[in-house]
């Protein structure tokens, strides 16, 4: 299928289809875990920060190890305060104003950070991997941190249960389709509304069927409207197109470079080329905990 523009947010008009197993199906998409973390975090920070006020923000990242994405992220947001938490070690050298805590994030840490940065705007990102049996417990834990910290905006991994007609209560926001994810994964990310503790219900069945359509149709389609032609780096797939769009928003909205200008084209080519080379040469495609497709 050929489509002009990509879809980033799961909405009421998103395509849906019944989930089915695809174990023997030949996949045409690529799973790049650390590249996904980087690109999706760039999207979150670009949409959440006013560049001229960047010293007013603190970025708290729970689940930051081993740090391949964070090391590159520091280059893109050099003036932003980073606070990283993970019981596993951060194996990369992280420059800039960065605190690293090799331990689990807890309510006590949330209270400490809330007191220390009560005049700042806290951006919280959580990559917490947990079994489906403890899914609701995980959501409750994140809701609690969000409330204690008085989070300005949060980005949270969301994997709602399969084959369920139930729903889950969680923070109000927009569910974003993944980039460079597993071929049949159901995980996406929720980016909350600004300065909210409002809770809404998310339908398990709607989420399952929207993600099934995304994996089988949206992500495997060809996207015809790509303004930046870089055939040695990108093709016209969903992931390449989404990455280009997210980086374009970063260049225009965060770096304040005029869209379509010579400076824009130069910066985009440099950035896209460098990111592609970085993930090819400096980090594994899959994390060590990943067992198989």
Model-found features: residue ranges?
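Class I SAM-dependent methyltransferase Rossmann-like catalytic core
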Residues: 1-55, 293
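Rossmann-like AdoMet/SAM-dependent catalytic core
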Residues: 5-17, 60, 67, 168-293
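Well-ordered, non-membrane alpha-helical segments in soluble/globular domains
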Residues: 30-44, 100-103, 110-111, 133-148
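Conserved SAM-binding loop of SAM-dependent methyltransferases across substrates and taxa
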Residues: 66-77
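Short beta-strand element of Class I
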Residues: 80-83
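S-adenosyl-L-methionine
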Residues: 85-119, 128
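A short SAM/SAH-binding and catalytic strip from SAM-dependent methyltransferases
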Residues: 120-134
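Conserved beta-strand signature within the Rossmann-like core of class I S-adenosyl-L-methionine
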Residues: 150-159
